[in-house]
Regions:
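Short runs within selected transmembrane alpha-helices of multi-pass transporters and secretion channels
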Residues: 1-2, 82-85, 154-174, 180-192, ...
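Hydrophobic positions within alpha-helical transmembrane segments of bacterial inner-membrane proteins
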Residues: 43-47, 119-127, 190, 194, ...
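Helix-terminus/linker motif at the lipid-water interface of multi-pass membrane proteins
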Residues: 43-76, 94-95, 132-141, 201-204
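Hydrophobic faces of transmembrane alpha-helices in multi-pass small-molecule transporters and flippases
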Residues: 1, 20-51, 55, 76, ...
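Short alpha-helical transmembrane segments in multi-pass integral membrane proteins
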Residues: 1-36, 92-158, 201-240
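Conserved catalytic core of Hanks-type protein kinase domains
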Residues: 6, 46, 127-128, 136, ...
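Small-residue-rich hydrophobic transmembrane alpha-helices
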Residues: 64-130, 162-186
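Short, flexible micro-motifs
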Residues: 38, 42, 51, 63, ...
Length: 240
């Protein structure tokens, strides 16, 4: 359908001679330069989630149910801030492309503040809805208690470290600093999130709260590293 529409001469963009189209290898390489590290980062994140889930599965059905619901709630309270981060990538990309590096720095700071406000509001709303959700879901009393405690922990810790660990990174990726972001994210996830979770669960007998302690450690380390990187301004030296 798209090909047929493109052949319509009344369209603003009309393509009716496909045999004349040739790949722009230079442009493709620049796209892959950004896309491949991001893809590796996301793949490692999925492997990490699998490793954590395999550890949680050894804690019993009560812990599994509590952690599953908490995961959903944690995803919900981060949606608004993630949207800010995705929008930031477009804004920073345009600023860097136009050579306005000062504006890129300004917008990263400004949208980080907006994301922080979104995180605080979202966390409070989700926390207020936690008990009604566990009741509507028919969760066992012990699972509901674990879920409430983990959601409380997230509500306290997420506004402290989440924004610094993710929002500046969106902007730095848009500026072409993708390798540093990939290495930092993968290293902090495996060294903090996965390792802490497995260690606390299997050595000290922690319950599913170990997952969120590990995640908070991951966010904190990542936030510190990305903050140092942001203030160093080295991420502005890339050419896309």
């Amino acid at each position: 359908v798209v090909i047929i529409k493109l052949r319509n001469p009344s369209q603003t963009i009309c393509v009716n001679r496909y045999y004349t189209i040739r790949p722009d290898w230079d442009l493709i390489k620049r796209v892959l330069y950004i896309g491949i590290p991001s893809g590796i980062e996301n793949s490692m994140f999925q492997f990490g989630k699998l490793a954590i889930q395999s550890t949680v599965s050894t804690l019993g059905t009560v812990a599994i149910a509590a952690n599953a619901v908490t995961n959903i709630l944690e995803n919900l309270n981060g949606v608004a801030a993630q949207g800010v981060g995705i929008g930031l990538m477009t804004i920073v990309g345009q600023c860097i492309g136009a050579g306005r590096k000062d504006e890129a720095i300004y917008y990263i700071k400004k949208l980080s503040k907006m994301a922080e406000a979104a995180i605080i509001i979202s966390c409070l709303i989700v926390f207020a809805l936690c008990r009604p959700i566990t009741i509507l879901g028919g969760m066992e009393a012990e699972s509901a208690r674990m879920c409430f405690e983990m959601t409380l922990f997230i509500t306290i810790t997420k506004p402290i470290s989440w924004v610094l660990s993710f929002i500046p990174a969106y902007g730095m990726r848009a500026a072409g600093d993708v390798k540093f972001s990939m290495i930092t994210s993968c290293a902090s996830m495996w060294l903090c999130r996965v390792s802490f979770t497995i260690f606390l669960c299997r050595v000290y007998g922690f319950g599913p709260i170990a997952v969120w302690i590990g995640m908070f450690a991951d966010w904190t380390v990542r936030g510190i590293v990305f903050t140092i990187r942001f203030h160093s301004r080295r991420w502005l030296n890339h050419h896309i």
